A protein has these predicted regions:
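Consensus positions within tandem repeat domains that build extended binding/scaffold surfaces
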Residues: 144-146, 166-171, 189-194, 212-215, ...
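Short intrinsically disordered, low-complexity segments
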Residues: 14, 18-21, 31-34, 38-41, ...
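Structural signature of tandem-repeat unit edges
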Residues: 105-108, 117-141, 151-164, 174-187, ...
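Alpha-helix C-terminal capping segments
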Residues: 96, 286-287, 330-334
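Sequence-pattern detector for short linear motifs
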Residues: 5, 9-10, 34-35, 67, ...
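N-terminal capping/linker segments that flank leucine-rich repeat
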Residues: 2-19, 23-149, 155-160, 252, ...
Length: 536
């Protein structure tokens, strides 16, 4: 056998078999022949999966699935069902005197239900004469699905006095380019202009106070839109997948932006928020949009899950001082390069910056009390982090595979470091754990392949499995006197680890705790040691 560590373990196993429970503080070694004999007898297959397969294949997959599922995992939002439904009910109506329009009378008012075949430029009159009633009726409404799927309409002009447009009224009018609405229009119902793929020009009137979901989704040629202040809430998926939409202006009075409202607006570069009225941005509101920068007014207090996720062009963000938390996956998969978290933020939920591969700099406030798991998951460009004194816990997978992270400054009050918190941080060279820490979770510093020195203070009483797994350049380890158990696979595959002194507090050495430490020539074991597991 070629490895010194096998000599060491063979000696430990042989002597432990002869000396029950209590071992003196001695350095042990064994002759080559003894090592070969014992190792061949006791070296079984690993009884637990290695973190490289366990975390990368299982945890990483689960995390990615969780993030993509809540952070705009679909590349596009499917076209609403009613846009594909051949059974959409087209309204009945009777023709006008000139035969150009179809209508029905409801409560002494005319509703438009369609137009004559071949109509390209539609001008709707302000009144319609009904021959049966011998009366003029004001035109106030376009009925639901009135022009559904009409491929001939190109322009529509509505009269003064028009107050509403029904659901799906112009859905799928793929040649419609321009719509003129009067200031009297108050409501546009769901799907009204959905999939009008050539619509380039539409002005929403100041009178508008309601717009339903999907009203302008998949309007692929629409380039700009101004939302009037009377429209206090922007509906869900209202402009989703408007691929050419570049500019959005929200006038004072707009209070909330609905979920998926601008989802998939890949050309969207600028959103002008109102100064004081907007308070809420709902889930996935700008997911997969083309935004390059965001400046949220201080009136914004709530930004919901994944609101700006998958914004690959997003470089800079100014957060509102009115916010107290960052919700789950807010900027996951975005192109962020730097961000300063304001003092008002006390909580950062899971996955907020996960997979932000360009994120280099983050400033965390001293007011921060909670940072959940996977917040900086796989932020491969993050180089340094200063953790505030207000933070007591480093959560699981917090800096998982932040491969450029080379400088970590722990806060004065941190007491635990979670599982896989710094897993795969391959640019770290030294780990100095504060003397306030009592627990290191499983795989906390595993795969930190360039770490050469680790100091575990006396305050630490709990070292999890695999904690320093595969730290291939680790040579210098100091273990504090608070540790009683060197758990399974603790230093597994630390193949440059040469000399370790186990403190007097340790009573047990778990299986494979030093397995694969091929450079180890001696190990100091304390009188307190009660058991050594197989292949330790």
């Amino acid at each position: 056998m070629r490895s010194n560590w096998r000599k060491t373990i063979a000696g430990i196993v042989a002597i432990a078999a002869l000396i029950p429970c209590c071992l003196g503080t001695t350095a042990y070694a064994a002759p080559q022949s003894a090592a070969d004999t014992v190792i061949s007898a006791v070296m079984p297959e690993l009884e637990e999966p290695m973190p490289s397969s366990q975390v990368d294949a299982q945890i990483a997959a689960d995390v990615k699935a969780a993030i993509s599922g809540t952070a705009g995992g679909l590349e596009t939002i499917p076209t609403p069902n009613y846009a594909e439904d051949p059974d959409v009910e087209i309204p009945d109506g009777k023709p006008t005197q000139d035969g150009k329009l179809y209508y029905k009378i409801v409560s002494k008012k005319a509703q438009i239900t369609g137009c004559a075949p071949g109509t390209t430029d539609l001008v709707i009159p302000d009144t319609i004469y009904d021959e049966e009633d011998e009366e003029d009726y004001p035109v106030t409404f376009i009925a639901a699905a009135a022009f559904y799927g009409n491929k001939e309409l190109q322009t529509v002009t509505m009269p003064d006095g028009m107050v509403g447009i029904g659901a799906n009224a112009f859905l799928g009018c793929t040649n419609l380019t321009s719509v003129s609405m009067p200031d009297s229009v108050a409501s546009i119902n769901g799907g009204a202009f959905c999939s009008c793929s050539n619509l380039t020009d539409i002005k929403l009137p100041a009178s508008l106070y309601f717009v339903g979901d999907d009203a302008f989704s998949y309007c692929a040629s629409l380039e700009s839109i101004t939302i009037p202040g009377n429209l206090t809430s922007i509906g869900s998926t209202m402009f989703a997948n408007c691929a050419k939409l570049k500019t959005v202006v929200l006038e004072e009075g707009v209070q909330s932006i609905g979920s998926n409202a601008f989802y998939g607006c890949s050309s969207l570069d600028t959103v002008q928020f109102p100064e004081s009225s907007c308070t809420r941005i709902n889930a996935n509101a700008f997911t997969y949009s083309g935004l390059s920068s965001i400046e949220l007014p201080d009136s914004v207090t709530n930004v919901a899950t994944a609101a700006f996720s998958h914004c690959q062009n997003l470089k800079t963000v100014k957060l509102s001082s009115g916010m107290t938390s960052l919700r789950k996956d807010t900027f996951a998969y975005s192109g962020l390069e730097s961000i300063e978290i304001p003092d008002s933020i006390t909580t950062i939920k899971s996955g907020v910056f996960a997979y932000c591969s360009n994120l280099k700099s983050v400033t965390l406030p001293q007011t921060l009390k909670q940072v959940d798991e996977i917040v900086f998951y796989s932020c491969g460009s993050l180089e340094s982090i200063v953790l505030p004194d207000s933070l007591t816990k480093i959560s699981d997978n917090l800096f998982y595979r932040c491969t450029s992270l080379n400088d970590v400054k722990f806060g004065a009050n941190v007491n635990s470091i979670g599982a896989s918190a710094f897993y795969g941080c391959t640019s770290l060279t030294e780990v100095n754990i504060p003397d306030t820490v009592t627990k290191l979770g499983q795989s906390a510093f595993a795969e930190c392949t360039n770490v050469t020195k680790i100091t575990v203070p006396d305050s630490v009483t709990d070292l999890g499995k695999w904690t320093f797994y595969n730290n291939a350049n680790l040579t210098d380890v100091t273990i504090g006197n608070g540790v009683t158990n060197l758990d399974n696979y603790l230093f597994y595959r630390c193949n440059k680890l040469d000399n370790v002194t186990v403190p007097e507090s340790v009573k047990k050495v778990g299986q494979y705790a030093f397995g694969g430490c091929t450079s180890m020539s001696n190990i100091q074991l304390p009188d307190s040691l009660e058991s050594i597991d197989k292949c330790a």
